[in-house]
Amino acid sequence: MSQDKDLFLALYKPVHQPFERFCKARSYGQMHFKDLMQETLLIAYTKFDQLQEPDKFLYYLFGIAIRVLSNQRKKIQYAALSEINMTTSITQPAADTRAETEELYKALAILPIEQRESLILFEIVGFSVKEIATLQQKTEEAIRQQLSRGRKKLLVILSSKKESKDAAYE
């Protein structure tokens, strides 16, 4: 058991930062990112013996995190809660940066799931198109289209919010 723990920690340490960024961006508006990380890591550790390819540990964590979020969404829908807590702690030094990050995460939350995940993995986590295609089991061209469409929709969403703010100040 101690050997499993050591191996798990050895695999987790180098992927902690990208995993945390993924959870922050992906969990926005659904649950607190630290809760997502903890639940994902608990599941990953208890089912660690099922990991067949240790070099794909980060993908393994992403898959679990996505399923945890899906289950969370189903619980919320089943319980018929009318509102989801949209407060997520974002650790950025400047207030302007925090506000911009908050706006970006709100806009990302509006995008369709596939476009949102592709953008998060590519722009925030730093994955290549090829890695995302492998993770999502799609062609690289399909991922490029998701990224392109997602960026366009994100631009429209953020532009319309900026225009509405500018109009409010006039």
Model-derived features: positions:
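A short, charge-rich alpha-helical start-of-domain segment used by transcription regulators
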Residues: 1-21, 25
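Sigma70-family region 2
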Residues: 2, 41-56, 75-76
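Arg/Lys-rich amphipathic alpha helix in sigma70-family domain 2
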Residues: 52, 63-83, 97
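A short pre-motif secondary-structure segment
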Residues: 118-122
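Structural recognition of an alpha-helix C-terminal capping motif at a helix-to-coil junction
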Residues: 35-42, 55-67
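Helix-turn-helix DNA-binding module
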Residues: 109, 113, 125-142, 156
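C-terminal edge and immediately downstream basic/flexible tail or linker adjoining helix-turn-helix-like DNA-binding
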Residues: 2-8, 134-135, 151-170
